[in-house]
Amino acid sequence: DRDSCVDKSRCAKYGYYGQCEVCCKKAGHRGGTCDFFKCKCKV
């Protein structure tokens, strides 16, 4: 789910967010971005 993406995906502060994108899409979201080292999923 959304929280599992945030927990397990580490990323640069404003950098690469490929992990977030993939994880969020698998969780049923449109994608994700990186915000202060955490993944934020787009609903």
Swiss-Prot record:
Disulfide-linked positions: 5-23, 11-34, 20-39, 24-41
Keyword entries, A-Z: Disulfide bond, Ion channel impairing toxin, Knottin, Neurotoxin, Potassium channel impairing toxin, Secreted, Toxin, Voltage-gated potassium channel impairing toxin
Pfam families associated with the record: Toxin_17
Subcellular location: Secreted
Expression (tissue specificity): Expressed by the venom gland.
InterPro entries associated with the record: Ergtoxin, Scorpion_toxin-like_sf
One Gene Ontology term of the molecular function aspect: toxin activity
GO cellular component terms, semicolon-separated: extracellular region
Chief site of localization: secreted
Comment text on domains: The presence of a 'disulfide through disulfide knot' structurally defines this protein as a knottin. Has the CSalpha/beta fold, which comprises one or two short alpha helices connected to anti-parallel beta-sheets stabilized by three or four disulfide bonds.
Known function: Blocks Kv11/ERG potassium channels.
Family of the protein in this entry: Belongs to the ergtoxin family. Gamma-KTx 3 subfamily.
Protein name: Potassium channel toxin gamma-KTx 3.3
